Structure formats: structure tokens, C-alpha cells
Amino acid sequence: MDTITLTDHHFLHILQLASSALPVGAYSYSEGLETLVESGTITSQSTLQQWLEAELSYGAIRLEAAVMVRSYQATIMGEMETLRYWNLWLSAARETQELRNSSWQMGRSLMQLLGKIQPEILSLANSVGNPCNYAIAFAIASAHWQVNIQAALLAYLHSWATNLITAGVKLIPLGQTAGQELLLQLQPLISHATVEIMSLKDDELSCCSWGLSLASMQHETQYTRLFRS
């Protein structure tokens, strides 16, 4: 991976976007993990690590992240029609109602937040329309703040991993130290996935996420739930 140079200003912006304190509701989603723990598929730190590594290697998060990159570029170039296209494309690519709704809810929350703290973004938000996927909203914010796209992608994947590890810590359960150890172990793969995703062409966008989709569908009727997905 190339060396990334950020000004203090840009570094602080991306830290804010990737923070678990960002009020977009990410903490309320497990992306099917709750069902996988309930069924006994994920029972430990090692099985959670295997699941997250598989998702980073060929799962739906790669598709989502690739669309984030394209939306960032469209925002920088002022290509609103392209931005709307990728928003619709990502909505169509969601395989379950829970996954689609979670992306829309987080995207809406982020755009509403940005509209209040950075009102000049409102015109971009309005041009995308509603519903807006979270990856699109994240891309708009990163581009508006002129954060390096590679840094933005790293932050996006790291934030995703942090959220699911936090869910795993609660559900399995795991200790906080185990969660941080797992996040550290995922760093090389997050870095590698970033390089791969940055180089993908449009006709190479694909994923293998049937496990996630089945878990998400089963979660919709799961009797006892802590999470919304």
C-alpha cells in the first residue's frame, strides 16, 4: 500500500467519520451475527475472526466499499447523475430487507447530521435523494472534506470491523481484550482489501455473501433479538 499523507485537518475529519461515537445507529446492527451466534455457527473469537476474514475477502462489504470509492470520485467530479446511479445500484444489490434498511437508516442519519454541522452539504444530499445508502453518505462527507480516498476507504472498513467486533463481544460473549486483539489481527487484511478494492473495475464488482444473506433473512423472524439486523 502507498504511504498516505494527511494534514491534521483531514486526519481529524476522518477520525470523526469513523468514530463509534458518530450518531448514525451503527451500534444497533449486527449484520446477521446475532443469528449466527444463536445457531452456534459463531461461538468464539476464532470463529468470529474466520467470519470477518471471509467477509473482507469476498463478502458484501467489498461491494459496498467499492461503491463508496466510486461515489467519492463522482462527488469530487460533481457528477450527480453518477452519484445517484451508484446509490440506486447499491440499493438493488442488497439481498435482504434488513440489510437494505440498515444502510438506508444509517445513510439518512449521517446526511441529517452533516446537514446540521456542515449546511453546505445539503445540496449534495438533496441531489442524491432519499433513501441514501450509508456508503454514499460516507463518500460525500469524505469528498467534501477532501480526505484522501485511500484513507477514507481504510477508515470505512475499520469502522465496519469495529462495529461487528463490538456486536460479537456482546453476543458470544467475548472480553474487551479479545475484541481488541481481533481488531489488531484484522489490520493486515483490511489494508490488503483496501488495495484490492481500489483497483476494481466496474465489471469486476461482485461478492459471495449467501451466508450473510441467509443469516439476515433468518434474523427477521428470530424470537429474541438485541440487534436490528
Swiss-Prot record:
GO cellular component: cytoplasm
Transcription as UniProt keyword: no
UniProt-recorded Gene Ontology molecular function terms: nickel cation binding
Subcellular location: Cytoplasm
This protein's UniProt keywords: Chaperone, Cytoplasm, Nickel insertion
Positions of transmembrane segments: none
Pfam families, alphabetized: UreF
InterPro entries linked to this entry: UreF, UreF_sf
HAMAP family attached to this UniProt entry: UreF
Protein family (similarity comment): Belongs to the UreF family.
Assembly and oligomerization: UreD, UreF and UreG form a complex that acts as a GTP-hydrolysis-dependent molecular chaperone, activating the urease apoprotein by helping to assemble the nickel containing metallocenter of UreC. The UreE protein probably delivers the nickel.
Role according to the record: Required for maturation of urease via the functional incorporation of the urease nickel metallocenter.
Name this polypeptide is given: Urease accessory protein UreF
The organism's taxonomic lineage, starting at the top: Bacteria, Bacillati, Cyanobacteriota, Cyanophyceae, Nostocales
Gene giving rise to this polypeptide: ureF
